[in-house]
């Protein structure tokens, strides 16, 4: 199952975030969910949404997976990409932080249960 959220970032821009979890799992308001937050936000490329055995296995073990589509990526077109590159790159980082804070504020997880992942250029989001 999944839920789609639009997270307000530092400048009011709404950042799309999809949250995936095992069917039948209640993720609302318990703050006990282990969450893996992933982002990329670079080169105008989309965060991969294809089948991923690691994410699937994690969900089967009770993890919640959150994909943050931060500025710099290609999920919302060229303007979205431009808003997260070069002198606008801080928007990518601030979008990712906003998504993490949102998951905590909405009581989906607790700071001690939140992990972050970014590969390749997405690693700068979590460094």
List where the protein language model places each region.
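Cap/lid segment of the alpha/beta-hydrolase catalytic domain
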Residues: 1-119, 125
